[in-house]
UniProtKB/Swiss-Prot annotation:
This is MATH domain and coiled-coil domain-containing protein At3g58270. Residues 156-167 have a biased composition (Acidic residues). Pfam families: MATH_2, PEARLI-4. It comes from Arabidopsis thaliana (Mouse-ear cress). Gene3D superfamilies: Apoptosis, Tumor Necrosis Factor Receptor Associated Protein 2, Chain A. It comes from the Eukaryota. CDD domains: MATH (cd00121). Residues 156-193 are annotated as: Disordered. PANTHER family: MATH DOMAIN-CONTAINING PROTEIN, TRAF-LIKE SUPERFAMILY PROTEIN. Transmembrane segments: none annotated. Residues 271-335 form a coiled coil. Residues 6-131 form the MATH domain. InterPro entries: MATH-CC_domain_protein (IPR050804), MATH/TRAF_dom (IPR002083), PLipase-like (IPR007942), TRAF-like (IPR008974).
């Protein structure tokens, strides 16, 4: 079931918890003359998280050399509080080799299936996608009135205040089971080129990332001394994975799950295998993992103490009731007989 309004498409998946298929496709919808559909993995695409992708519908029927550049924003709607909705965004070039793109780790299944979490109401999951087509190479799926919808420049996107690609949304190079950033659902893909970028120690990064990356090289100048890849696209993609990993580790232990830490450990191994010197980050990740263990152990102790306190309060309440009864009995026993009682 789906509903299209302007550039937004709403997909309501009924009886989500009872879905048996590995993956589900939404109805097809049109945005700027291009035909799309959503792809979801209800039980996760190799991870314990909802996996969600935007796909070009009918890509097998498009002519050779077709390409589409699109920005899109996903939102898994929390039906109890919109502020708790899970949102992710990215942009990517779609072509014959990359007909879908999105997020393997959109939302943890534990949080999704929480009966009081607000994501599943009456068995329904609601997903909203907002798509903006930036450029089209090859024919459109439907005729449009204006040539402007055939080719949209990136500058037009910026004029409409569409968000720039962020660190978290460009983690495109990681393996599917090691990454929670934007990626194709079925293979390792090269990150889309970024038109506006700056060089920091041989890495092309976004202007918003310059300060952070510069700080990393200042504190760890040998971080890339043995780094293998020379291609700028690959180097940028690895840097985005590193920045996203650091951002993940900066979250509170309450926000981090064991799955998150497992993914972080896998991502770290992936980066070190490429030649990045990250011994310092490995130590910090161990500290974060230890803090998570301490938090969980502390939560367990708190729960145990709360239960013990509850039992003690109940026992105290019972003792107080028994005390009042005993006092009443003593009061009765102390009362003297009257003349009438005796005579």
């Amino acid at each position: 079931m789906g509903k299209e309004v302007d550039n937004k498409f709403t997909w309501v998946i009924k009886n989500f918890s009872s879905q048996q298929s590995r993956k589900n496709y939404s109805d097809e919808f049109f945005v700027d003359g291009c035909k799309w559909r959503l792809l979801a993995f209800p039980k996760g695409n190799g991870v314990e998280k909802l996996s969600l992708y935007l796909a070009v519908a009918g890509s097998e029927f498009l002519p050779d050399g077709w390409r589409r550049h699109a920005y899109f924003h996903f939102s898994v709607v929390n039906q109890l509080s919109d502020e708790l909705s899970q949102a992710r965004e990215t942009k990517n070039w779609f072509d014959a080799s990359t007909s879908d793109w999105g997020f393997t780790s959109m939302l943890s299944l534990k949080k999704l299936h929480d009966k009081d979490g607000g994501f599943l109401v009456n068995g329904e999951l609601k997903i909203v996608v907002d798509v903006s087509v930036l450029e089209v190479i090859g024919k459109l799926d439907v005729p449009v009135e204006s040539e402007e919808t055939t080719t949209k420049a990136l500058s037009e996107l910026e004029e409409n205040d569409v968000p720039e690609e962020s660190e978290e949304t460009t983690k495109a190079l990681s393996k599917v089971d090691e990454n929670d950033g934007a990626e194709s659902n079925d293979s390792l893909k090269e990150a889309s080129s970024v038109k506006e970028s700056m060089d920091v120690n041989g890495f092309r990064v976004l202007p918003s990332q310059v300060e952070t990356v510069s700080c990393i090289f200042e504190r760890h100048p040998d971080i890339a001394s043995e780094f293998g890849p020379k291609n700028q696209h690959l180097r940028s993609a690895y840097m985005n994975v590193l920045l996203s990993l650091i951002k993940t580790m900066c979250q509170s232990t309450q926000e981090l799950s064991k799955d998150d830490l497992s993914d972080a450990d896998a991502a770290l191994a992936y980066l070190t295998d490429a030649g990045l010197n990250l011994n310092w980050l490995e130590e910090k990740l161990e500290e974060v993992s230890e803090k998570k263990e301490n938090e969980e152990a502390g939560e367990t102790r708190v729960h145990e103490i709360e239960e013990e306190l509850k039992e003690l309060k109940l026992k105290c309440s019972n003792l107080e009731a028994q005390l009042e009864k005993e006092k009443a009995d003593v009061s009765v026993a102390r009362a003297p007989f009257s003349f009438d009682d005796i005579v």
